[in-house]
Amino acid sequence: MALLQIAEPGQSSAPHQHRIAIGIDLGTTHSLVATVLSGKPKVLNDVQNRRLLPSIVHYGDNTTHYGEEAKPFIIADPKNTIVSVKRFMGRSKADIKFQHPYELVGSENEMPAFETRAGRKTPVEISAEILKQLKARAEDSLQNPVNGAVITVPAYFDEAQRQATRDAAQLAGLNVLRLLNEPTAAAVAYGLDQESNLATDRNYVIYDLGGGTFDVSILRFSQGVFEVLATGGHTALGGDDLDRLIVKWAKKQLNIDVLSDEDYAVFIVAARQAKEQLSTQDSVELKLLEATLTLDRPTFESIIQVALDKTISVCKRVLRDAKLELTDIQNVVLVGGSTRSYAVQKAVREVFAQEPLCTINPDEVVAIGASITANQLIGNSQDGSLLLDVTPLSLGLETMGGLVERLISRNTAIPVARRQEFTTYQDGQTAMLIHVVQGERDLVEHCRSLGRFVLHGIPPMTAGQARIEVTFQVDADGLLTVSAREATSGVQAHIDIKPSYGLSEADTERLLIEGFQHAEEDKNLRHLKETKVEAERELEALEQALKVDADLLDEKQLEALNSAKGSLKAQLEGSDIQAIEQAVQQLKVHSDAFAALRMNRHIDHALKGTKLDDWSKSN
């Protein structure tokens, strides 16, 4: 499918010159690289004819091992063997709650580094090592340098996690054409647009359960256009978690409370093997230390049911977001190695009441879709479809009273830009703090802060006179830039949102679920805050007017005005909206009379020294 005809970085200016573009699935458990050869996508093998590169890096005394060569060290040297590094990407040390054998260093609010035999290594550096291996594989296989790459990320990755992925790619020497959502890549791989001869719209569910992340997206194909209607997921739910549930069961069976790092690694390997074998066998044996356990399919289903229930809950919520019923879904596409599990396929089949599509190798489908997109973006091919990704969470900024003004709503198609005018709150205000937030709630304190910057140089004016245009721009990779410009002076400032850590799975889930649960409460609270802000603005304006023209009021009038002011200030201490609004109206009775006196004075001052003839001449 042809994306919007906008030149991307690295795009060929010579339309008939074939350039090498690759698609990379940078996975939690495995990673792959694919390209398009003679019009057909192909997953590239290494010199030993292996397609999957385990996402593992081992740091030895004098050498570094990757992939399959690093696997034996998971048990032999777990502290120096980094597995599932994707789960650490763009996350703060405080966010990392899951069990792991590593020594993490750094402050709680920053992305940590792993303490290894080769020194401290960040998740970005380790991911770059994996990407370098894939790039080298592609160049060895194709005997040509790679001109550009599309790298896939979970649809639910936030700003920090996407930026960390792009940083890793650049560190690996890759020209990043685009970061592409994994479910979107799967849609491209399946060529769902080939059903374009159908007159009716087609809706598809992409159920992607990988090694460490879960994503579900609903795509609609209509009149040659792919659109992502809604997305959801968990940034830390996947095959790794199924393995951990099996380990938890095994520990209970063997009456073990705590495992050493070395023994835990043994249990994880055995659990993973058992999970894979149960896709084709009714029961398997787990050899754990000096004990052997038997695990059958029904027991396995009951063990992982809690994880499956989470994925189904997300599916139902995304259906609600898209305003669709189960009967509106034409196909369900399975993506990710964990969907090979018969238990996963059974759960999906029962929920959607149809046989899911899994004709393409679920481990390879994302890389294949990425390679097709890369081939298009590099300028090698064009066809008739358009692909629109969406923002996973709403983006906005803080206004007076700690309220959130949303500029870009969740599930908005990207790339996108939104502009909105704001103004100053106080007389003579010469600077404005722009606080950018992400989330679904109406109060800043309930959303996630993405960054702050200050617009300086605003000309001093009366409150409400300045015009500040704020622009939110999300690019095709889902990365956000915010700019602000004052209209009369032209002064401007901007920020590229590059936070040092991302949302934990708990925070991501909280932002969405609380947004739904507290919608009515937030609406009422927003009304209260807005009412208070407007009342405080009235009081501030009145205070300034009294400093200049209080002599216009006699003692009785001033006393009545001050009494109404005091009454309003007292009501502002509470949370009774109706009482505040009544106090505002009572104050307006006196302040309007005062305003009329002020206007008369200013008119008299303006007319002083003029004659009637002057007015006649002007007419």
Swiss-Prot record:
Q: Which UniProt keywords apply?
A: ATP-binding, Chaperone, Nucleotide-binding, Stress response
Q: Which CDD domains match?
A: ASKHA_NBD_HSP70_HscA (cd10236)
Q: Gene3D superfamilies recorded for this chain?
A: 1.20.1270.10, 3.30.420.40, Actin, Chain A, domain 4 (3.90.640.10), Substrate Binding Domain Of DNAk, Chain A, domain 1 (2.60.34.10)
Could you name the domain of life of the organism this protein comes from? Bacteria
Q: Does the keyword Acetylation apply?
A: no
The terms under GO molecular function for this entry are:
ATP binding; ATP hydrolysis activity; ATP-dependent protein folding chaperone; unfolded protein binding
Any one Pfam family here would be HSP70
What biological process terms from GO does the record include? iron-sulfur cluster assembly
Q: Does the keyword Membrane apply?
A: no
InterPro entries named in the record: ATPase_NBD, Heat_shock_70_CS, HscA_NBD, HSP70_C_sf, HSP70_peptide-bd_sf, Hsp_70_fam, ISC_FeS_clus_asmbl_HscA
Please report which protein family the annotation says this sequence is part of. Answer: Belongs to the heat shock protein 70 family.
Protein role: Chaperone involved in the maturation of iron-sulfur cluster-containing proteins. Has a low intrinsic ATPase activity which is markedly stimulated by HscB.
**How is this protein named in the record?**
Chaperone protein HscA homolog
Please name the source species: Acinetobacter baumannii (strain ATCC 17978 / DSM 105126 / CIP 53.77 / LMG 1025 / NCDC KC755 / 5377)
Q: Encoded by which gene?
A: hscA
